[in-house]
């Protein structure tokens, strides 16, 4: 077991139950990792030693591919918990519904799960959105519908595709992890690459890369766009035109599963949205605060600005620099009613450069912490207007994940 974090621990527990005779070794480069009382461990600088001696190597999704040995014999042995999970549930006859995409996968997966549940079916929402899927093998019966949010990390070493696959969108992302756009696309493609006949893939045809990936499937291919959404945004609790695409995907998949249309529409109307995704935190200090901590690319922050319109007065941007192009975001900000931009370290300096290459109407500020950013926003934002947290960058240089970033945002607002 390579990597002994949350997913690695869940995988080891699953092996104890479903492969009790397996001889397990745990490997992790973190020398301070929690020790297992039963199994040998390879930690620190020697964590990748003697991999050729193992029959199966299960890699945790957080391990960048370039850290693993490139030896062909070793690469052939590498798999992941996603592969093990999909193979196991296929043997039980359960329906797997995998959702991937640079953006929109969490909301789309949650919408599908809500609709299927509304139809009275047994459903589990697992994967990148919550608990490791492998931890729920005991919960799966023949008639269970498993909705999996699948990141490129989780698809990386997978050689089994879900029964139903969905590609919501495609933007350059996680390039520091994958090493290149080609590797990122190849990982995403595993959601379709191993689909046999009798399966189906749904893809957003506005993204050429999604269509290329869909062609790899031997299953039924179904295209969708935002125009296929069965409701207007105003008829739901969702914000932003991009959610039309998410509703379109969810409704098309649900119809394929023979869910009646009235059931689909009812579930879409009742769906309340997800935390940290254009989530209004209410009015504090006379200002409306919107948490869009999930947005870690320029494209998703542009979508957030489009969703909220002219009420955004202050925006908090920046974080870990993944080399993204911020020129289109700069144009969008200059074309909006945004007056103040607060920049975090890292990509903040390149966002500043992009903004300063055009007109200099907008006032720029720097903040070294969330507390400093929120205090600035309290002073700068006009009453009744919006302060938006949508950083257009990941924030691993400051926070554990986007959830922690959003939670810290709320804490600072409430002080």
Indicate residue ranges for each PLM-predicted region.
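Short active-site oxyanion
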Residues: 22-24, 53-56, 122-123, 196-201, ...
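N-terminal leader/targeting and accessory segments in enzymes
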Residues: 1-80, 84, 239
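Short beta-strand "acidic-cap" motif of Rossmann-like dinucleotide-binding folds
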Residues: 23-28, 124-125, 147, 223, ...
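Active-site beta-alpha connecting loops in nucleotide-dependent enzymes
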Residues: 1-11, 25-33, 274, 293-362, ...
């Amino acid at each position: 077991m390579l990597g002994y974090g949350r997913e690695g621990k869940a995988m080891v527990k699953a092996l104890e139950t479903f492969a009790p005779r397996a001889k397990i070794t745990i490997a992790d480069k973190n020398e301070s990792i929690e020790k297992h009382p039963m199994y040998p461990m390879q930690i620190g600088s020697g964590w990748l030693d003697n991999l050729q001696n193992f029959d199966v190597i299960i890699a945790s999704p957080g391990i960048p591919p370039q850290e693993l040995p490139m030896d062909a014999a070793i690469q052939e042995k590498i798999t992941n918990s996603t592969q093990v999970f999909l193979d196991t549930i296929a043997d039980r006859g359960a329906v797997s519904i995998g959702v991937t995409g640079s953006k929109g996968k969490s909301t789309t997966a949650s919408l599908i799960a809500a609709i299927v549940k509304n139809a009275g079916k047994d459903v589990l929402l697992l994967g990148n959105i919550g608990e490791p899927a492998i931890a729920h093998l005991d919960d799966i019966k023949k008639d269970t519908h498993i909705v999996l949010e699948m990141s490129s990390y989780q698809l990386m070493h997978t050689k089994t595709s879900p029964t139903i696959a969905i590609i919501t969108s495609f933007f350059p992302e996680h390039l520091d992890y994958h090493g290149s756009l080609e590797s990122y696309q190849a990982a995403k493609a595993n959601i379709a690459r191993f689909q046999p006949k009798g399966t189906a893939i749904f893809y957003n045809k506005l993204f050429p890369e999604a269509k290329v990936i869909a062609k790899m499937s031997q299953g039924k291919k179904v295209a969708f766009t935002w125009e296929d959404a069965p409701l207007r945004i105003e008829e739901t609790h969702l914000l932003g035109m991009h959610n039309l695409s998410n509703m379109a995907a969810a409704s098309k998949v649900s119809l394929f599963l023979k869910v009646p249309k009235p059931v689909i529409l009812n579930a879409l109307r009742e769906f309340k949205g997800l935390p940290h995704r254009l989530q209004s935190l209410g009015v504090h200090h006379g200002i409306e605060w919107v948490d869009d901590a999930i947005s870690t690319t320029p494209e998703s922050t542009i979508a957030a600005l489009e969703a909220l319109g002219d009420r955004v007065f202050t925006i908090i941007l920046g974080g870990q620099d993944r080399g993204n192009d911020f020129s289109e975001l700069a144009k969008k900000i200059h074309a909006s009613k945004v007056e103040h931009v607060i920049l975090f370290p890292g990509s903040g300096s390149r966002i500043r450069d992009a903004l300063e290459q055009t007109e200099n109407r907008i006032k720029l500020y720097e903040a070294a912490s969330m507390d400093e950013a929120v205090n600035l926003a309290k002073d700068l934002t006009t009453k009744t207007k919006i302060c938006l947290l949508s950083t257009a960058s990941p924030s691993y240089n400051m926070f554990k994940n986007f959830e922690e970033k959003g939670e810290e945002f709320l804490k600072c607002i409430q002080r």
